[in-house]
Swiss-Prot record:
Pfam families: Ribosomal_S17 (PF00366). GO terms for biological process: translation. One of the primary rRNA binding proteins, it binds specifically to the 5'-end of 16S ribosomal RNA. The gene is rpsQ. InterPro entries: NA-bd_OB-fold, Ribosomal_uS17, Ribosomal_uS17_bact/chlr, Ribosomal_uS17_CS. This is Small ribosomal subunit protein uS17. The keyword RNA-binding applies. Keywords: Ribonucleoprotein, Ribosomal protein, RNA-binding, rRNA-binding. Part of the 30S ribosomal subunit. Belongs to the universal ribosomal protein uS17 family.
Length: 84
């Protein structure tokens, strides 16, 4: 069997920690009763080895082994830099 690693695309909402970032993943979920689509956000803590991400960057992260209590994702690449 091939090993599947999860890859997510999200926006950096915090980069104040050393070698760590917080990435917000937004998704649309259909309300079970009313059928309206609602925006839901998941926050992931990811490892940024070179401290290259800034606030607002669009990044790609992938799942890895647990690196700390809350951090089990690592930065793959920066898709788009934030406009300043």
């Amino acid at each position: 069997m091939s090993e599947q690693t999860r890859i997510q695309l999200g926006r950096v909402i915090s980069s104040k920690m050393d070698k760590s970032i917080v990435v917000a993943i937004e998704r649309m979920v259909k309300h079970p009763m009313y059928g309206k689509y609602i925006k839901r956000t998941t926050k992931l803590h990811a490892h940024d080895e070179n401290n290259e991400c800034n606030l607002g960057d669009t990044v790609e992260v992938r799942e890895c082994r647990p690196l700390s209590k809350t951090k089990s994702w690592t930065l793959v690449r920066i898709v788009e830099k934030a406009r300043v």
